[in-house]
Each structure stands twice: as C-alpha cells, then as structure tokens.
Amino acid sequence: MKNRHLIPSLGYCIAVLAWGISCVGPRTLQAQHIHLNAGATNTTQDAQLYFSNGNVYDTNAGYDVYLAFTNSGSFSNLYQGAGVTFAALASTLDNGGPAFGHAADGAFLELQFVSMSGPAGGVFGVWMQDVGNPGSSYLLFTLPVGIGNGTNRIAVSESDGSPGSDPYGHMHGRTFTATQPGLYTLGCRILDTSTNGTGGGPIHTPSGLYHLYFQAGPTISSWTMSSNSFGITFGTTAGKTYYVESTSNLLAPNWMTFAGPFPGNNYLQNVATNSGARQLFFRLRSN
C-alpha cells in the first residue's frame, strides 16, 4: 500500500511516499504485546483509579500499538492487532497478588472508550474472540474518528462484582481494528462500576483521560518543514528493519538510503534532514 503526501512551501517541494513501514530511533527493541495495568492510588473510598504503568505506553511516551492489514478471516480488509491487554491488578494471593497499587476489594473496573482521532473517515473497532470458535471474533462496538463523547465500555475486572471480591482481571482475546491506514489516538478512562461504595455507588472515582496511539499500516503521521530542512514522524512495529530513502526525481529515481537500517520498536520515530534541494521525494521501506 502506498501513501503519498505533497507539501509545497516557500518555493520548496517535498513528497513523502510510504511503501512499507518505517522506523528510525534510538530506543531498544520492545515486545509487541503489552499489558496496561489498572489500579488505584489507594484502597479507600473515592481514591482515583489509574494505570500503574500508563506513563510508559501513553502518547507522551510515543508508544504505538501496531495494526497490520489482513485480507482474510474475521478482520478481512481491516488493519488489526491484539498488541495490548487491559488488565487489573490483583489484591489476593489466588490471583498472584497483592500487587502494589491494586484497587479496593469489591471494585469492578471497566475501560470506557471516550474519544478517537485519526485519518478522515476512519473507524476504530473493538472485537472479542468467540469462545466457541477461537478462530473467529465478533465486533463489540466501533468508534468513528472525531467522536469525543463515547460511552462504550469493556470489562477489565473478572470478578462477579460482589462485596470483597478481588478486582483482578487479565483477559486476552480482544482485537482492535481500523478501516483506514494512519495514526489513531484513543482517549479512554478507567471506571469503577461496582455498587459497593458509599451509598451503593462505586468505591473509586474515575481515572483521568489516557491517550494511546494505534498505528494502522505504513503511514507518516506528521511532518515539519522550513526553508532548508524537513522532518517526518511515523509509527513502527517490532520485528521489522526500516530504511528511509530519498531521491530528487521520480521519473528516473535513484533511491539513496537517507537513514537506516534500524530495528522497529513500536514507538513513533523521527527523521530530520537539512537540504538545499528544491524538490525531494522520500519513501519509507521495511523488510
């Protein structure tokens, strides 16, 4: 798949073409599957919920969950990936706890999908594996790009929500999809939907809004440009090697390696150059 962006400015024209997937950056290789662990600041009434490791994987950290294109199965013609599991920290030995930062016993944690930004016309989907047929999945709900008041939720805790129950949860089988290539930004928060708090309400107050990147396919998420310099930012995935190449002529191209090879690591990466050329074309390639 190819994405092309023409950017004229100050008499200077640079075209960017994405031919594969790209990555440049100093970070070390990361695993493709992560766990975001939900807990609370403490276990008292009205203590706020949070992701104990959210700062490692949110947009401020530049981490991206990669979605790869597929043309078969439940996710045919979609970008799909299961690179993140939303978990809840355990309070009991039976579930491997007590973990530091766990929510109060009796809390039932859910993740609310609030907002979505990304490529125009894109739709983000949340799917669940079919227990009776593990080879297939069914759609739970979608979030169109531009939504800012979403109310859909998925359970993070696995308990029955009864008083004193461990808030622990660790459920695999969820897949996330996108209909268009590009960088998607999910806004989400953790809720306690139990009725075991004061007055029959929740024990904990909601978390703040977390923002997470999902990179669908090989695209350039942003670029910067001045009179003699150009920079691009793009998402990556582990297990790939990346090259940034450039040429001054597309009719008779002589592609030269501008940066790379670099290992992918599931973080947004940046490449910048200084050039006096009036026209340059860049492409991003992986193998």
Language-model regions, residue ranges each:
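N-terminal secretory signal peptides that target proteins for export/translocation
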Residues: 1-9
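Bacterial N-terminal signal peptides
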Residues: 11-23
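Boundary at the C-terminal end of the N-terminal hydrophobic targeting segment
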Residues: 20, 29-31
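Contiguous segments within soluble domain cores/interaction surfaces
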Residues: 32-173, 194-217
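Short tyrosine-centred short linear motifs in exposed loops/low-complexity segments
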Residues: 172, 180-184, 240, 278
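Short, hydrophobic beta-strand segments
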Residues: 174-178, 272-275
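Beta-strand-rich extracellular modules
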Residues: 189-195, 285-287
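Short, composition-biased motifs enriched in small/polar/acidic residues
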Residues: 217-287
